[in-house]
Amino acid sequence: MQSKLLGLQDEISEARDKLRTSEARVAQNLKRVDELKAEAASLERMRLASSSSTDSTVSIASRGGAAVAATTSVPDHVEREGIQSRVRGSGMASTSYPSHVPQPSQAVRRGPKPKDSRRLRSSLELEDGLRNFWYPTEFAKKLEPGMMVPFDLFGVPWVLFRDEHSAPTCIKDSCAHRACPLSLGKVINGHVQCPYHGWEFDGSGACTKMPSTRMCHGVGVAALPCVEKDGFVWVWPGDGPPPDLPPDFTAPPAGYDVHAEIMVDVPVEHGLLMENLLDLAHAPFTHTTTFARGWPIPEAVRFHATKMLAGDWDPYPISMSFNPPCIALSTIGLSQPGKIMRGYKAEECKRHLHQLHVCMPSKEGHTRLLYRMSLDFWGWAKHVPFVDVLWKKIAGQVLGEDLVLVLGQQARMIGGDDTWCTPMPYDKLAVRYRRWRNMVADGEYEEGSRNRCTSQYDSWPDV
């Protein structure tokens, strides 16, 4: 064991050296982010200047304005440090809607769009159809009794906490009295107390206490159906009660140990980030200071689909899948820790790294990213002091390399460009994800088609 610890310490030391050598590249990326923000701000000024000239420019502004604001207001802690993993909790709430609660379906809806799912099209909008899914919002073990976790979902603020029975619950993060964020208060005996006037709310959203005044019954805030499963807290923001429980694909595979669970708020539209995660052809060009450092440029990169939304990469030993509505799973075959086995399938390798990415649409132009990393070897390594800090640092460097690119794409889309003007064969999985999004936008995606290929899927061209 001592020799293993010494070996791991050497590898950690080597990893730290590599991270230090990437500082210049990260600084360049941050400078480019600043330039892209300035360019996006310039585009917004141009849009505002021309908004009164024609009706068409007004229409464009309504589609892009919110995304421009998101791009031009990147917080300093995001732009200067790449990513900051925020340790927050996770919870579980009632699956019924109380009578006093306004339903999520009462939110303002956009008008219908022409149905054309076969054509690829980029979008920065959050389609209404995306609401009718279960969403992982936080890692369950990070929600301790007495803790609150605020988050946004489809532009609505919510807060997670554990009720008097330690069951996770989710209510709107806005007091029914004066709209003060409830997450600024505290949890008392499983109820959230507003810090403004002391009103208290239970897990169903009902107000249970109004100090210093006569109690008004029937007052409350909205609540979402919420369950805890596979180490995540899931919520249902859709229309009416959920039809079933969350899916079964998020648990770590048998024989794997979880080594890292990281949450990051990213100032990028969740679909752009998902398409980036579903693309490996960019790795040797983008991730030159992290995991793909030293990778040779392949003569050809291919994705061999084994299912409609899953398959294997060639020549990389990586299997990957997209799982509606916003989850990417990947298994990477390793010859040794940190080294891939080119020319093999992941299943043919002896060691594996399993990744789960959740790209939750927090609001237009912003994503709540949940990342879980598991290994089927080195189970003892998760007990090494501060090793989680190393994993988070590495994950931050990788995301930083991607962030400058997807922020650039987002700025171009705001200016009217299309990210799918020239798709290539190695874009197959990302293309299929985008066609799925197009189906959701057009109202063509059926709940029963989630786990099987439909005739609509079968008719999709890949490029």
Swiss-Prot record:
Chief site of localization: plastid
Residues holding [2Fe-2S] cluster: 175, 177, 194, 197
Membrane-crossing segments per the record: none
Gene: CAO
Annotated keywords: 2Fe-2S, Chlorophyll biosynthesis, Chloroplast, Coiled coil, Iron, Iron-sulfur, Membrane, Metal-binding, NADP, Oxidoreductase, Plastid, Plastid inner membrane, Thylakoid, Transit peptide
Basic and acidic residues compositional bias, start-end: 113-122
Protein name (database record): Chlorophyllide a oxygenase, chloroplastic
Function, as annotated: Catalyzes a two-step oxygenase reaction involved in the synthesis of chlorophyll b. Acts specifically on the non-esterified chlorophyllide a and not on chlorophyll a.
Organism, scientific name: Dunaliella salina (Green alga)
